Amino acid sequence: MATRGNVPAHMQASLPALPAHLQSDTHITAHLASRFHVSLPTARLSSQGLICLNTFTSSTRGPNGDKEGSAMGEAEDLARRAWARLGNRAEDQAFVFFGESGSGKTTVRSHLLSSFLSFSSTPLSSKLSLAAFVFDTLTTTKTTTTQTASKAGLFYELQYDASSNNPTLIGGKLLDHRLERSRISHVPTGERSFHVLYYLLAGTSAAEKSHLGLDGHVNITTAGTGLSRSASVSHKRWRYLGHPTQMKVGINDAEGFQHFKNALRKLEFPRTEIAEICQVLAAILHIGQLEFGTGQATLTAAEESGGYSHEGGETVTVVKNRDTLAIVAAFLGLGVQDLEESLRYKTRTIHRERVTVMLDTKGARENADELATTLYSLLVTYIIESINQRVCAAEDSVANTISIVDFPGFADHSSTGSVLDQLLNNAANESLYNTCLHSIFEKTAEMLESEEVSVPATSYFDNSDAVRGLLKHGNGLLAILDDQTRRGRTDVQFLESLRKRFENKNKAITVGSATSTMPGSNFATTNLAASFTVRHYAGEVDYPVHSLVEENGDVVSGDLMNMIKATKSDFVANLFGQEALNTVSHPAEKTAIVQAQVSSKPLRMPSVSRKKHDQLRRMASRRADRSPAPQEEEPLPGTEEAKVRRTKPTATGLTQGAAAQFLSALDNITKSLTAPNVNNYFVFCLKPNDRRIANQFDSKCVRQQVQMFGIAEISQRLRTADFTIFLPFGEFLGLTDADGGVVGSDREKAQLVLDSKHWPPNEARIGNTGVFLSERCWASIALTGSQAAAYFGGDIGSPSRPDTPGHNPFSDSKARLVGSADGTPGSFYGDEAKGGGYFGSRELDAKSDAGASAFHSGDMFRNLETKEELAEKGNKKKVEEVDVVPVSSSRKRWLAIVYFLTWYLPDFAIKWIGGMKRKDVRTAWREKFAINLLIWLSCGLVVFFIIVFPELICPKQNVYSAAELSAHDGKGKHSAYVAIRGQVFDLGAFMPNHYPKIIPQSSLKKYAGVDATGLFPVQVSALCQGKDGRVDPTVQLDYTATNISGTAAVISSTDANRKYHDFRYFTNDSRPDWFYEQMIMLKANYRKGSIGYTPQYVKTLAKKSKSIAILNDRVYDFTTYNEGGRSVRAPPGEEVPSGVDTDFMDSLVVDLFTQRAGHDVTKYWNALPLDPGLRSRMQLCLDNLFFVGVTDTRNSPRCLFARYILLAVSILLCSVIGFKFFAALQFGGKNVPENLDKFVICQVPAYTEDEDSLRRAIDSAARMRYDDKRKLLIVVCDGMIIGQGNDRPTPRIVLDILGVSETVDPEPLSFESLGEGMKQHNMGKVYSGLYEVQGHIVPFMVVVKVGKPSEVSRPGNRGKRDSQMVIMRFLHRVHYNLPMSPLELEMHHQIRNIIGVNPTFYEFMLQIDADTVVAPDSATRMVSAFLRDTRLIGVCGETSLSNAKSSFITMMQVYEYYISHNLTKAFESLFGSVTCLPGCFTMYRIRAAETGKPLFVSKEIIQDYSEIRVDTLHMKNLLHLGEDRYLTTLLLKYHSKYKTKYIFHAHAWTIAPDSWKVFMSQRRRWINSTVHNLIELIPLQQLCGFCCFSMRFVVFLDLLSTVVAPVTVAYIAYLIVLLATESDVVPLTAFILLGAIYGLQAIIFILRRKWEMIGWMIVYILAMPVFSLGLPLYAFWHMDDFSWGNTRLVRGEHGKQILLSDEGKFGPDSIPKKKWEEYQAELWDAQTQRDDARSELSGYSYGTKSYLPTGSVYGGGYNDTQHLMMAPSRSASQLDMHPTPMYGGGGGHNQSRMSLAPSEMLGSQSNLMMPSGRSVADMEMSDLTGLPTDDMLLNEIRDILRTADLMTVTKKGIKQELERRFNVNLDMKRAYIGSATEAILSGQL
């Protein structure tokens, strides 16, 4: 590099000062490199620009170790120069930063700001520095290129007043632009989210972490990884914080948090508000931890009746980690349930309809991310606006401003995946770069041209095409994007709009194809990778359009807004109450927020300077004359105009998308930068390499950036024209103190001055009215003294002089700024020396500092509400008194029983341990517990009766008869028992222990099963004390076994082994106690029982001269004693002593057994005159010598009773089943019913079923073989909800199936619903038409419950019972002629005037579920049953499973469904009292056939079934668990003379639950509702039958069987045990009976040839424990599992209860009602008025009160109207081929006509759907016999029209002429007259 003189070339800091041959990209790069390598990483573009290279080390040290030559030094120098211009010229100063991410923009910006603030060392300057730090903390992040990447556009404004040369800082303003919100939920790999989140996690104390839930005690598993984290926070993976390694990237987060809190405190944020900010930040982190899974909504909601076709509950998304959810809810001041609801649902606007989408787990995760993103965006906006409110000065006091503009760097790809963020930031960079080019090239050129000064032109890259293409209002790319968003267009439509606008019109924008052709295919498909390309100044970028339109909408769902309305946190309410949140209200109800949008532009605008220079203003006005018309001014935020603009309605409800808002904010910046009194400086930040290596210069990398920013062209331009100041001649001459003595014009004088100054021509030129100067030249004449010294302390680059260090005159007064050296707040730029950060002087705010220190040293949440208190507060509902209800006496009695049973459970324990805060919930739990106690007591009683009671009556005896003993002979698998002296022992167990061991066991086993007493002779004297206490040892007593069976195997006294056990006195080995000892041992170890003798057999033995009798249930035998068994024997060698008394037993005892042989001698024994000693001695002798067994009472009467009681129970159960079997044997052919003419309604309630299920149900109902014109298909859609797996809301699916066009949009009408408080007011839409399927043309009506405008989540949804009540209440009011709601009047109008049937004609209603398929002959068979039996009020058919083989769960249910219908319902049908008519397939009689009295829709049924106050456990089980069964109960209760029956010939197929959870929930509903409904039925007196044959007895048995179902399993298990252990015939008989049960069932399905049921029966039997044990126990304990809603009861005065609700109080008057006659009169009047003006028959709708042409019922006639419509199911040509009208009955009409006139079917009603061709008028009026026939009227109308003036004739005039001719009132023929007139005039007749 060349040198100039002795000064090295690299010392030249100003690039324009380089020679011309060095003004290229390559040479400039080389020059920057030479400076970089000598630690001079900066350069200048004269006075207008600064170039800084990031050294990745310190930005505060230059080549000499001080700041001179560093980025910090250059920033300070630039600030001094701008400060001088601000003070001396009163110009606004603006600094625009350019640079890619990682170029160090944020650091240089902080140095620049610190320099300006140091000029005004006041507390305000400190606050403004802290404000910038807070902004960076909230909006910067660490990326792969830098640790301080800015992710929001910044416009920082310093405000000054007007004061001579030293402006006073009076305020500041932070304007944030488009925060990169997507980073919150999608942290790129290797990057971080916003710093403040890491600060919070690292900087909080242990107590604060505990409060915020950030400690390790919350067990959280990272979604998708399955890795559970340990208790340490540092090892827990936070989803919103990226990879855990990002928490250790060299940033001191803990210190950053302390700085952040200090900054907020010094900015005057209250302590409580800082705590609230931290709680919201913690809530955001916890939202990221929420894990979602798929579950079942098994708890019935408070306003729902549950089931629909989903009998056990619908599939919903649930939060798995509810502890984390509770933390989020607590910090947001919300209820846990409310928060979960809002996360699982999302409401959208589709075709102007609000629709709630039931989200899957992915959708719920995205919804949670949206909540987190919205929270963070609003929090940032709130903090910034709060700062602005504290530091911003009043607009009218601001004289000048210094603005710093810093937007995120240009990006060629989106790291977070947000294309919109990338597009908007790049557009901002494009606009700011264009402003730079315009300022340097165009603005100067315009000024010079206006002064007729010519300079050489400089070529440069002009990005105007890109700027116009992107930013032009009206038809720029961003404007088009916003327009397409507001119109609700798709991405493809947006792309096509871009094509039309830019193709071949703007070379900067290229639009890709919206379609693509796959290889091997000739058909174009949608291009999923469709994109457009923008040629930016920094290069071409492709922008995919996928989801771009939706992302631009930036919509916050109405569910979230509706949820936040209920927050108990004032801070959160303030967040969502900001002006930054643009809300969209429902057009019909302004208080209902449909959706919202977080603003992408700041809440404030740049200040408008009040001080202008006249010359500049003049020049600006000249330029304006040549410029296009200005764009419309954006209204100031917060003004009324802005509010009005925000509320303009659009297709999507949005007024502006993110693009339009950003574009508006960008316009404000551009206007601010290009204002006449603004001097701009441009700072270009470059990164020396892409790898963030310190002190390494990559020439290629830098050259690309130099080329990108056009630095060479800018430098060349400044070499020819470096003019930034224009001075009029007078001002210029005044500054230069030109000699007044010089004669000449001012121009000449100025020229002389210029000549004398020797300024180069590129820095000083003279114009027509003034002088153009560079900033350096101006400073040399304008600044004096210290100002000049300060300014020239750093030279700006004279061509002849290199930079020299200068003195800083502000160093004495400037406050040194403190920072940190570790890359944390204060300075984010390598290891900064203390001095260049955000934080101002410690001395300036010592008081605030001390307060902050005290604040962050402890627990910021001390003395604030705890997390638990916040949770309780959030769950508490705001309630108001809505009703006072009395407490019934029965309820009081029941509660008394409940508290008697649960008194030992204190209320506080239930409250705190059970978590039940509400009194009514605790009461319900007590009721549940009491009911369970009663159930368990009942089960215990049954167990006692079955098992314990028989044992009490007949205690178990361990006795063995001879036969039983013989069976234990040890052969085969039999055990080996042996009897010795009446005792039975286990020989098998004894044999291994026999002594001596040498005796083989085979020798011992021969004694098995026999009485071996003979083997064991006894020593009498050892076992008996005799009469006087001693028996001579020589006395012997032989033992002769009692023949107890006649064939007993008895061991004789001659047995060979006897001698081995003979140890009597006379033997050689006398052991008198041996036998006694052996017996003690045997009894202790081997005894099994005793030999048993029945009393009858004892008597038999006595008859055989046996001296045997019973004493105390023990049998003693004196036969041997009496018959010579006594003897006297002495040992060998000894003489037998004489006089030995062998009568050792008392004679009284002997006589007693001899004389009373065969009897029980107990009472005689007790009467013997024996002294106690003798009696005791005799008893001892009896037991040891004469005992042979015990009394066997097993066949006694009481034991037989105990035994057969089990059999009796089995017989009783089997008898009931037997009756059911005979009831099921309904043989006979399927009688084909006669042609029926009754009108039938088929109602299908729809909720979230899929299209296939709905189509099957609707098609099956339409295809039923029943007269189509007498069927009416009514589908009631419960809410605007998109079910999981569906792509459209359920009503739209139904309407698409029925062929209704999307253009048909009736007005929603009010009606009453079942709900809490204001939810009783609902709104619905009515559609009607004809549905054609497989040759059937069926009229239909669809009622869609859409909800009031104020309903955001699940609008209109009220549950299945409410869907039933819509039709039932309507028919009730029709039959009772009661005033109707608008919706009901519209339904009446549709059915009567459009479909053509009087609603009173419908006699029967068939209710099916939306997933039920009915057999074609179902309706005919049910109607036939009604006609055969006029006392029948309801019938059900057999329902089978259509998904029988889906899973084992469904397989278990197949057989159960079958027997529940063919046994239970068939049996109940015998009594005419089927206790449960299933809602999935039942037909009801609407009115009595003879009298027309309403039955199904009677007053009592409607009143009880529409009960809204469902606040007790009993009522909830009735109405929320089993509404179908309760409806049947009401029918039996109020219409006891009518019957309910089961018809097995009518078939339907439904879907059963296929998962355990849904199945258990379904059965919980069924079991509990069964119990509560049977309790309702038992007290009824009207149930038929008498005694045990009454239905009440059967109901009681059903209730008992339901309650004690678990015992049945125990009973069967008990029988199995009995059968296994006893060979008795009784349990075997019981099993035979139980087998007969299934045998009878088998007979049923065999006779009906249901062979497959054999297999299903086996599956059912295997599942018996589940059905009879598991499910009942689960159901009983979960009897109180409900979503209790927000209505509750509290105890009031005088025994009354007050009903409280947070849904508001419903006023019935809010829904207008009107009788049909009044409404019909209005129709006629309106029609007559229009008839006078128009010759056209009209239809008139309550919903619109508008004139609508009536269409044909054949279809197509209503497709173009707003309200009335028919499905265009068939074409006209198809219809005209029918020889007779479809609904015609032939009565009086010309049958030769091919088709009817358009209104003939609707207007006359003369033959539409009437029995036997009769008209509505024929059926209703009795005075029409004198009216002329239709043919007579037709002939007269033709005659009148033949002579009438067709220009003046009206239908009213024709009617009046006909009345004159026939002399009769023809009001009832008005419609026919009109339709006939129309037909004649149109040529159809």
From Swiss-Prot:
Stretches the record annotates as Actin-binding: 666-690
Glycosylated residues in this chain: N219, N429, N668, N1043, N1068, N1462, N1568, N1759, N1790
GO annotations of cellular component type: cell septum; myosin complex; plasma membrane
Domain DEK-C: 1827-1882
Recorded catalytic activity of this chain's protein: [(1->4)-N-acetyl-beta-D-glucosaminyl](n) + UDP-N-acetyl-alpha-D-glucosamine = [(1->4)-N-acetyl-beta-D-glucosaminyl](n+1) + UDP + H(+)
Family: In the N-terminal section; belongs to the TRAFAC class myosin-kinesin ATPase superfamily. Myosin family. In the C-terminal section; belongs to the chitin synthase family. Class V subfamily.
Known role: Polymerizes chitin, a structural polymer of the cell wall and septum, by transferring the sugar moiety of UDP-GlcNAc to the non-reducing end of the growing chitin polymer. CHS5 is required for the sustained growth at 37 degrees Celsius and is of critical importance for virulence. Especially important at infection temperatures for maintaining the cell wall integrity of developing yeast buds, elongating tips of hyphae, and random sites of expansion in sclerotic forms.
Name assigned to this protein: Chitin synthase 5
Organism whose genome encodes this protein: Exophiala dermatitidis (strain ATCC 34100 / CBS 525.76 / NIH/UT8656) (Black yeast)
Gene name of the encoded protein: CHS5
